[in-house]
Swiss-Prot record:
Protein name: UPF0756 membrane protein Asuc_1151
Sequence similarity: Belongs to the UPF0756 family.
Example of a GO cellular component annotation carried by this entry: plasma membrane
Membrane-traversing stretches: 1-21, 52-72, 82-102, 123-143
Organism: Actinobacillus succinogenes (strain ATCC 55618 / DSM 22257 / CCUG 43843 / 130Z)
InterPro entries: UPF0756_TM (IPR007382)
Keywords assigned: Cell membrane, Membrane, Transmembrane, Transmembrane helix
Keyword Lipoprotein attributed: no
Residues in coiled coil: none
Compartments it resides in: Cell membrane
HAMAP family found in the cross-reference section: UPF0756
Entry membrane topology: Multi-pass membrane protein
Pfam families linked: DUF441
Length: 150
């Protein structure tokens, strides 16, 4: 019996451990699910996840963001509130973040190796700086601006 080192499996284990240490359940769960998929009969579904996973994730995230509105916990602002400078600024920032996330998706598609650094940076930001793990796409968008890519 020969042992074979699986670098992708090792990376997934490291990401899962960093997720645990950084209290980042989304990284921990994602890395663990992908590791289980890679090591079992579920590996045949990895191309499906690769092709549709990001879109499915964005749909689920959008449902989560819209749910408080549908539940009546967040009210739709009146027209006069839409004209307030803070509301205008929030619209501009929302558009900027969406644009950055779009650049991030393009960069991650063209240079997926950078995703590892972004994920580790996100985990370190959560663990060391008390941040919240919401921004790999936006981080990739900012990185694309810094690199002058996409």
């Amino acid at each position: 019996m020969s042992l074979h080192f699986n670098s992708i499996g090792f990376l997934l284990v490291v990401l899962a451990l960093l997720g645990v240490l950084g209290n980042n359940s989304s990284i921990t769960i994602s890395a663990t699910v992908l590791l289980l998929m890679q090591q079992t009969f579920l590996s045949k579904y990895i191309p499906v996840m690769e092709k549709y996973g990001l879109n499915i994730g964005v749909i689920i995230l959008t449902i989560g963001v819209l749910s408080p509105i549908v539940a009546g916990k967040v009210k739709i602002p009146a027209l006069t509130e839409l004209l307030h400078w803070k509301m205008f600024l929030s619209l501009v920032v929302g558009m900027l973040v969406a644009w950055l996330a779009g650049r991030g998706v393009s960069l991650m598609g063209s240079q997926p190796v950078l995703l590892t650094g972004l994920l580790i940076g996100t985990i370190l930001g959560v663990g060391l700086l008390g941040g919240i793990p919401v921004g790999p796409l936006i981080a990739a968008g900012i990185l694309s601006l810094l690199l002058g890519k996409v």
